[in-house]
Regions:
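Charged, solvent-exposed interaction patches on well-folded alpha/beta domains
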Residues: 1-167
Length: 167
């Protein structure tokens, strides 16, 4: 038993928090940032992380990221995604270190690293509302006090282009 009263099973498989594409294979990592295993198969329930800068990966070792702050933010994100059972296909780390989440045809711009737990918990309901649509959920104005997110549907070209008769 551990100090928090939960049973610890040393034989238990570690949970995959996310994966990176490395040398043509998917390398899965846990919530502590350790590379667990690599497979050619991508598991649907594990978000693919793109845009992260890191050095060579070694199994069972911590992923050697260029910016530790960005990585701890990523791990905070994957933990919240798992906690609220969100279906996220991809987490894209932008140049500024902030993240875009991609779920089916919806892109979520988290905008900054604030209020992650609240943003992700609210996102579960938002994603249900826009299921089947394509577009962007912008969380630029979202905070604990002002739960505001803007959904911008993706414009389809066929609606914009008027039919021209060639007769």
């Amino acid at each position: 038993w551990t100090s928090d009263g939960s049973a610890e099973d040393s034989g238990k498989e570690k949970k995959r928090a996310g994966c990176l594409l490395y040398n043509g294979k998917y390398v899965y990592f846990d919530k502590n940032g350790y590379a667990l295993e690599s497979y050619e198969k991508k598991y649907d329930d594990v978000p693919l992380v793109t845009g992260l800068k890191y050095d060579e990966l070694v199994m069972q070792e911590k992923i050697p990221v260029k910016k530790e702050k960005v990585f701890s933010y990523l791990l905070e994100l994957t933990t919240a995604i798992d906690k609220y059972n969100l279906s996220i296909d991809q987490i894209y780390i932008k140049e500024d270190g902030n993240a875009l989440l991609i779920s089916d045809k919806i892109t979520v711009d988290l905008y900054n690293k604030k209020d992650i737990d609240i943003k992700i918990s609210e996102l579960a309901g938002m994603l249900k509302k826009v299921k089947g649509k394509s577009g962007t959920i912008d969380m630029k104005y979202f905070s604990e006090d002002h739960k505001i997110a803007v959904f911008q549907p993706k414009k389809s070209w066929k609606n914009l282009v008027k039919k021209v008769s060639l007769s």
